[in-house]
Amino acid sequence: DPVLAGELVRKTEAGEEALPHLYIFGGGHVGKAMAAACALMPVHAVVVETRADELEGMAPGVATRLTPMPEEVVRAAPAGSAFAVLTHDHALDFLIVAEALKRDDAAYVGMIGSKTKKATFRSWFIKTAGGTEAEFSRLVSPIGGEAVKDKRPAVIAALAAAEIMTVLALHAAPARQ
């Protein structure tokens, strides 16, 4: 029945619009693993990359965005979005994370890396990028926590996906009440 089919399409599209947005910056090994994990989750996942070849082979159902200026994607993202930053370049990570932290409506801002990378980012963010301690305090780094020391991309991705889904569920909970 064409009428029922049309109604089903409208309901499906409305449901997808209501999903929280997760932007995965970086399409390397961890980015691909994160995209695969998030393809099964109730999120609108988008992998953002500056290198076209890294967008090949992404999980079905995950959107991709090729752009020379990933921080513009951060600016255009809807309120309540989550940002997971794991590019191939620390300087690029810093620019993207700084842009995300300037938004007070981001549900999650996470960056892959070590304690040293986080400390270096903090110094740059406060001294050079004009960030505040309050903004910096919202950064989750390393993504996925520190309890599990396994550095395999699939493990990092699974831990980070669980962390992000928890934050998104808590962020959405007040809206459901």
Predicted regions and their residues:
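Conserved SAM-binding strand-loop segment of SAM-dependent methyltransferases
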Residues: V62-P68
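Residues in the short beta-alpha loop(s) of Rossmann-like NAD(P)-binding domains
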Residues: R51-A52, K115
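Short loop/helix-cap segments at secondary-structure boundaries that form the rim of catalytic
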Residues: D53-V62, A76
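Short amphipathic alpha-helix with an adjacent loop that forms part of the alpha/beta core around
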Residues: P70-A79
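Structural motif
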Residues: H21, S81-F83, Y108
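Segments forming oxygen-rich coordination pockets for charged ligands
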Residues: D1-T50, M58, E163-Q177
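Adenosine-phosphate binding glycine-rich loop
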Residues: I112-Q177
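ADP-ribose/adenylate-binding Rossmann-like module
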Residues: H88, E99-W124
